């Protein structure tokens, strides 16, 4: 697997030493897993060293409850920028996330995204080109292997003063979560752009937390939908961790 900088130079991907295997997200069992884990809004879960809250990234009290007084080194996230949009044949269109979640049927306000950045030192925001972000010297580009009806690449806005980079990986199956990023992409981001803890306020099916676990980092994850919290708990449990409700 290779990466390339903005000048086209191709470099070898960083190598991981025996990472913990990812069992993958069981999206098709989301409702069943919610019953198993009994996930509800307001819960905070301790997942090994990680923290996962079923909460709302728009609410300051939820963010502060999740982070306590910690200041992660990096916010890496993939915020929703449009919902309930499907293409012919049932495939996901360009603007999507959690299409079955009525309460998230909106575009994340710009001020929410700006506020979230204040909790960390740096940020990588996938889909940042859909917002009015400050100029950035370092854009990350994911060359996608999926359906030809979708865009060829996705862009991530960053706060870094570094050359832009492009990540390319072989085709891998769609896992059922509409904005899911491949694990290898997130591992690549964390390996190259973060040395400390990670904050993901739109955790989805938990891939950022998996990447953090593989690299020995701590992830603070927020997800508004209880069933996706359950998917993440099951996924992390499959990696040998024992999730428990905070304070119990």
Regions found by a protein language model. Give the residues of each.
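Amphipathic, charge-rich alpha-helical segments that serve as recognition/docking helices
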Residues: 1-9
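Class I S-adenosyl-L-methionine-dependent methyltransferase catalytic core
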Residues: 10-199, 203-248
């Amino acid at each position: 697997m290779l990466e390339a900088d903005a000048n086209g130079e191709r470099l070898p991907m960083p190598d991981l030493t025996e990472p913990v295997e990812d069992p993958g997200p069981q999206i098709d069992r989301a409702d069943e897993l919610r019953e198993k884990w009994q996930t509800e809004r307001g819960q905070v879960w301790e997942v090994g060293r990680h923290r996962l809250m079923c909460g709302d990234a728009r609410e300051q009290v939820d963010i502060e409850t999740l982070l306590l007084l910690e200041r992660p080194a990096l916010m890496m996230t993939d915020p929703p920028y449009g919902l309930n949009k499907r293409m012919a044949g049932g495939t996901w269109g360009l603007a999507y996330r959690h299409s079955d979640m009525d309460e998230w049927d909106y575009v994340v306000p710009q001020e929410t995204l700006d506020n979230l950045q204040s909790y960390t030192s740096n940020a990588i925001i996938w889909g940042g080109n859909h917002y009015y972000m400050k100029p950035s010297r370092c854009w990350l580009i994911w060359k996608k292997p999926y359906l030809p009806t979708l865009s060829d690449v996705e862009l991530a806005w960053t706060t870094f003063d570094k050359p832009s980079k492009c990540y390319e990986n072989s085709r891998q199956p769609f896992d059922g979560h509409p904005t899911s990023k491949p694990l290898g992409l997130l591992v690549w981001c964390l390996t190259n752009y973060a040395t400390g803890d990670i904050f993901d306020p739109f955790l989805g099916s938990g891939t950022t937390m998996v990447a953090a676990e593989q690299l020995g980092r701590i992830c603070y994850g927020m997800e508004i939908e209880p069933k996706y919290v359950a998917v993440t708990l099951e996924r992390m449990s499959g990696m040998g961790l024992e999730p428990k409700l905070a304070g119990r």
